[in-house]
Amino acid sequence: MKKILLIASMTAGLTACASSPAPEEDSRLKEAYSACINTAQGSPEKIEACQSVLNVLKKERRHQQFANEESVRVLDYQQCIQATRTGNDQAVKADCDKVWQEIRSHNNVQ
């Protein structure tokens, strides 16, 4: 009986050790994305580079929803910037600023 309890406790301990690096890595990816967004300062080229981190996050099941939502926001922002280059700068700039603030607010490093 003691052997069974010992084996069960060792298995539980090893399982806990084996699964702890994954959440740590996940949080590092989200932190990397947040840092990328925070340093992008609205630059479409820099934001495009952040997309590669989102692509990795999309592969992680627990981050798929976040990554998909952020991808939409980033694409919205890039389209918005493109619209300012081709159309009425002033009218579109306010919309771009709103989208950018939304991206920033979702990516504040806590």
Swiss-Prot record:
Name the record gives this protein: Uncharacterized lipoprotein ChiQ
Record's note on what induces expression: In the absence of chitobiose, expression of chiPQ is silenced by the ChiX small regulatory RNA (sRNA), which sequesters the ribosome binding site of the chiPQ mRNA by an antisense mechanism. In the presence of chitosugars, the chbBCARFG chitobiose operon is induced and acts as an RNA trap to degrade the constitutively expressed ChiX, leading to the translation of chiPQ. Chitobiose and chitotriose also induce chiP mRNA synthesis.
Lipidated positions per record (S-diacylglycerol cysteine): 17
Signal peptide coordinates: 1-16
Lipid-linked residues (N-palmitoyl cysteine): 17
Keyword RNA-binding: no
Any single Gene Ontology cellular-component annotation: plasma membrane
Subcellular location: Cell membrane
Note: ChiQ appears dispensable for growth on either chitobiose or chitotriose.
Keyword entries, A-Z: Cell membrane, Lipoprotein, Membrane, Palmitate, Signal
InterPro entries noted in UniProt: YbfN-like (IPR025727)
UniProt topology in membrane: Lipid-anchor
Segments crossing the lipid bilayer: none
